[in-house]
Amino acid sequence: MDVEALLQSIPPLMVYLVVGAVVGIESLGIPLPGEIVLVSAAVLSSHPELAVNPIGVGGAAVIGAVVGDSIGYSIGRRFGLPLFDRLGRRFPKHFGPGHVALAERLFNRWGVRAVFLGRFIALLRIFAGPLAGALKMPYPRFLAANVTGGICWAGGTTALVYFAGMAAQHWLERFSWIALVIAVIAGITAAILLRERTSRAIAELEAEHCRKAGTTAA
């Protein structure tokens, strides 16, 4: 069975369910590649022969984001900031003191906007719901930012990838594969630089946390 036949054998409903589930679990606070899954599904929707509807993909992602964030909010509000201390001991790679400190700093700086912007920032995507709940952000304000951010992120990402996929053939005919490779490399480079910048900020906050802990112990 070739790749095209394999893709055509996947029911569209299964694609929507996977998108909603992965995005929802990531929004709940469990690190999963929600954005990668969304982009992949949007790429599938740009191929008419696969019968995957881009509106279904975007809608599933929005529902997953809103429901997952709301559950994460409830958990954070129930257990408070000590929840992140326990998670940090078990999963230091994702919930270490530096990660939590950076996310909390962004929340303190941006307020409810951090929930909206968290849809577009990998670090905040898993922290937005639980941290908003732990910081006792009023739920109506959280929900408004959550729904708005989910629609903009999921709808915008799906539309961008869908229309890019539809226009890809014409674009390649005009600009060649070399231009596409250059564009992909530029995008990957930008993503790496952004990740490195975030990692440096986290490392600095980790070091600051260690210094404070050492001072307290002394």
Curated annotation (Swiss-Prot):
Pfam families, per this entry?
Answer: VTT_dom (PF09335)
Which residues span the membrane? 10-30, 55-75, 147-167, 175-195
Q: Respond yes or no to whether keyword Transmembrane helix is given for this record.
A: yes
- One GO CC annotation, please? plasma membrane
Name the UniProt key words of this record, in alphabetical order: Cell membrane, Membrane, Transmembrane, Transmembrane helix
* Record's subcellular location: Cell membrane
Q: How does it sit in the membrane?
A: Multi-pass membrane protein
- Protein family membership: Belongs to the DedA family.
Q: Per its record, how is this protein called by name?
A: Uncharacterized membrane protein Mb2670
Origin organism of this chain? Mycobacterium bovis (strain ATCC BAA-935 / AF2122/97)
Q: Upper lineage ranks? A: Bacteria, Bacillati, Actinomycetota, Actinomycetes, Mycobacteriales
